[in-house]
Curated annotation (Swiss-Prot):
Membrane topology of the entry: Multi-pass membrane protein
Keywords, in A-Z order: Membrane, Transmembrane, Transmembrane helix
Main location: membrane
Subcellular location: Membrane
Gene source species: Schizosaccharomyces pombe (strain 972 / ATCC 24843)
Domain of life: Eukaryota
The name this protein goes by in its record: Uncharacterized protein C27.05
GO cellular component: membrane
Residue stretches spanning the membrane: 5-27, 83-105
Length: 108
């Protein structure tokens, strides 16, 4: 009886530790994916602007093409919506302000 209780408690403790570690790993991987996404979006929008193609359609299609073969489609729509918001509020010539705006929205 005592052995069963000890083994049961040990198993529950072990299971709890595993759940906590898996949850922590999941959270860290989400933040890492989000960070990579921000970096790639910045690079794509910078490239588009450098080529004088910084219109809403070109930037968003560029981002869609970047993530076309990945599993990150669920992140694309909010990013594109934010870019539409940026380009309608901020003058497209002030590109530095747009990148800053994108960073502020993506970090939240």
């Amino acid at each position: 009886m005592v052995h069963t209780t000890v083994y049961g408690l040990a198993y529950l403790f072990y299971s709890g530790i595993n759940c906590i570690l898996l949850y922590q790993l999941e959270i860290e991987s989400k933040f890492y994916i989000r960070y990579q996404l921000i970096m790639r979006v910045q690079k794509e929008t910078t490239d588009a602007f450098t080529l004088q193609l910084a219109s809403k359609e070109v930037i968003t299609s560029s981002i869609y093409n970047t993530f076309n073969n990945t599993n990150e489609h669920m992140y694309l729509q909010p990013i594109c919506n934010r870019i539409f918001l940026m380009t309608s509020i901020i003058d497209i010539a002030s590109f530095k302000a747009q990148v800053l705006f994108l960073n502020i929205f993506m970090i939240k």
